[in-house]
Structure formats: C-alpha cells, structure tokens
C-alpha cells in the first residue's frame, strides 16, 4: 500500500475513532444506551446504508448455529493490514457492544462496529467454498477499490 494512500485515509479514520471514543466515554450507561439507540433507530435511507447477507452466508450461519446451544452472530471488522492496506476480519460472537450496528436477515445477525461500518456500508457478505478454502468474504463493497485475489484485503475508495 502506498504511503500517500495511508496519509489520505489516516485523518478520516482518526476522526471516526475520536468520535466513537467520545461515545464510549459517556459517564452513564443510560447515555450510552440513548446515544446508540438514537443512531440505530434512524430509518435506513437506502440499500447502501445496509450491509447485506447473501443466501450462502445465511445458509452457512444457520448450519453453524444448529450445532451451538447459543445462537452466535457473525461479526465483521476492518483492520489495517493485508496486501492492500485494510483487511476484513470475521468472527462468531454472542455479544454486541454499544457502538455496534446489527443487521438481520432470516434470523441471522451480522454485527459491525461503527468504525468498520463506514468502510463496509452497502457491502454484501457471502460464504464461498473452494477447493483450497471455505470462508466468509465481502463479495461486493462499494467503499473499496482494488484488493487482492484472496478477497480478504482492500483499498479504500476516496
């Protein structure tokens, strides 16, 4: 990843981190609850504000949930790294945090933290099975340009 891209993206990410840090530093739990509910109760204005789940993703999550006594959610995060600058991180989780956004389709929940959400809104999450691997992937991401063939890293569209 070029240093110039990092220099252009860093101020944006730093601003988002500061904004989320202020949200998490409210002095009372009720303030956190109020702030998170007001941001999540706003109507979704378009399909680009939602993170979509493919039928394959839903099928695989239901398979995983059937073997667990407690239904887990799929958590998507974005971290720096990978061959293109940012990489997707998928985990199974049973908890949400105050700064999470939750998307649900057919009983399957996807959880995305607010900082990562800005980099994946409008994206479609899929589950791909190939000869050498099977994994959750971000199949389409309108916020990304470029990326690597493994589909786990990307560059941010500025």
Swiss-Prot record:
Protein location: Mitochondrion
Keywords: Iron, Iron-sulfur, Metal-binding, Mitochondrion, Transit peptide
Pfam name, any one: Fe-S_biosyn
GO molecular function: iron-sulfur cluster binding; metal ion binding
Principal location listed in the UniProt entry: mitochondrion
Domain of life of the source: Eukaryota
Binding-site residues for Fe cation, renumbered to this chain: 83, 148, 150
Names of required cofactors: Fe cation
SUPFAM superfamilies: HesB-like domain
Transit pept. (range): 1-26
Gene Ontology, cellular component aspect: mitochondrion
Signal peptide, first to last residue: none
Cofactor-binding details, from the entry: Binds 2 iron ions per dimer. The dimer may bind additional iron ions.
GO biological process: iron-sulfur cluster assembly
Annotated PANTHER family: IRON-SULFUR CLUSTER ASSEMBLY 2 HOMOLOG, MITOCHONDRIAL
Quaternary context: Homodimer; may form tetramers and higher multimers.
Function: Involved in the assembly of mitochondrial iron-sulfur proteins. Probably involved in the binding of an intermediate of Fe/S cluster assembly.
Family note: Belongs to the HesB/IscA family.
Protein name as annotated: Iron-sulfur assembly protein IscA-like 2, mitochondrial
Species of origin: Arabidopsis thaliana (Mouse-ear cress)
């Amino acid at each position: 990843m070029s240093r110039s891209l990092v220099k252009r993206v860093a101020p944006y990410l730093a601003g988002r981190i500061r904004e989320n840090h202020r949200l998490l530093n409210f002095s009372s739990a009720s303030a956190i609850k109020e702030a998170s509910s007001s941001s999540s109760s706003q109507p979704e204005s378009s399909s680009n504000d939602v993170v979509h789940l493919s039928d394959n993703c839903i099928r695989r999550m239901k398979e995983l949930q059937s073997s667990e006594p407690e239904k887990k959610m799929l958590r998507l995060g974005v971290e720096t790294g990978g061959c293109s600058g940012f990489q997707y991180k998928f985990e199974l989780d049973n908890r949400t945090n105050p700064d999470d956004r939750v998307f649900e389709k057919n009983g399957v929940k996807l959880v995305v933290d607010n900082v990562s959400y800005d980099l994946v809104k409008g994206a479609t999450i899929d589950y791909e099975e190939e000869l050498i691997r099977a994994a959750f992937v971000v199949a389409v991401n309108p916020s990304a340009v470029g990326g690597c063939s493994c589909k786990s890293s990307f560059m941010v569209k500025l």
